[in-house]
Amino acid sequence: MGLMYKKQLNLEMKLANKQEYRKEKDSMGEFDVPVDAYYGANTMRAKLNFPISNLRFSRSFIKSIGYIKMAAAKTNMELGLLDKDLGNAIVTASQEVSDGKFDEQFVVDIFQTGSGTSTNMNANEVISNRAIEILGGVIGSRVPVHPNDHVNIGQSSNDVIPTSIHIAALDSINSQLIPSLEKLLIAFNAKSEEFMPIIKTGRTHLQDATPIRLGQEFLGYAGQIERSINRIKVAQNELAEVALGGTAVGTGVNTHPEFAINVCHELSSILGFDIKETSNHFQAQSSLDNIVQASGCLKTLAVSLMKISNNIRWMGSGPRGGFGEITLPEVQPGSSIMPAKVNPVIPESVCQVAAQVIGNDATVNIAGQSGNFEINVMMPVAAYNLLESIDILSTSCSNLSIQCVEGIEATDAGPTMVRKGLAIVTTLVPHIGYDESARIAHKAQESGRNIMDVALEETDLSETELIEILNPESMTEPGSSGVAIG
């Protein structure tokens, strides 16, 4: 029934597309492949087997697998395992794959075989056929360049796919995420310095608390971003160790003893950052622990961004019914029915990205558990979610800094609320005790008066002493405010 279904589906696709097809052979026999396709029978089978979604491996992943095939071909030529003419054609074809010239030829769905074998073969076939074309041969003939015997020498999908994930993640983190986070860190630090003179009411449990400088709040945001950068850099060190060289189950069967170390050296040269062979192939191929760790660091960043963005939204709420302590850049109209309404759309966008990344991490965690014995069987979905998280965090952090944080301005609402607030009574505690201070705060709240006026009536402290004790500036630093206690 399954075979009949596939044949029928293949026929329907032909009729619908009105394409011309070529006959191509693989280890299972003949199969029809579009005449202009660079992929082959193995890929075509996978394309028909997995009509699940429109999700494909990302540009960063295809770039990485192309680099691996190129480095492998160079290494195999050096080791005398690959003819120079064939090898040079494979190198050229692999470079073209990395450059994005054949992205449309990577047609296998993300929801495929759990090892990613279909995508490894997709790469092997595209590179093989392009190399055949370069050498003047017939695409689909598998001569003089064979996808397995030449492009895949010394490799297995079981070590190529996890290595591709690591390299794609590292490359994207280096080129996109870290620069984006550093830009956001600079923006928060700049606002921290700008806003340090401005004192506002603290809000623990969303209730009035002792004063804090607006700059101190932004310094906290900067600290969260800085620590996320540090965590991600630790994860980068783990990702730099790759599975290549373990082949099928980690033993390295059918690979040259010097293959992996030489390929890693070549990859380091191509990429501009260090790639090293794992010290333990059995853990590297049987688990996705390093990928799970990296995703966890991205999730932590997402949690930080959600909290920071919500704080910015709250502080900018209003303009008349909210806190209104800051104003955000007005980037677009906010309502189709309420004129002049402007919403905090950039922080809202970041919150949605954070939610997506947190969900992606849950998927990666489940994928990481799904290894039986010597291989993980959810590598494609782990790759998709990890790389998507890196991509959307990179763009959203850059967007947050440029379109929001850099343009934030402070209002006078914060200092005004401090003067009216009750929490400044806290600095009376060292002088008159907790219970008496609480009584003064309750009386101020009930009477609608401020702490200063009530304290003048209810304590023996002079106005001069109270001005010094209740000075909000002194409350934003360690120590007791005001006059000597006793």
Tell where the protein language model's regions lie, with residue ranges:
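Conserved, well-structured ligand/cofactor-binding cores
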Residues: 2-486
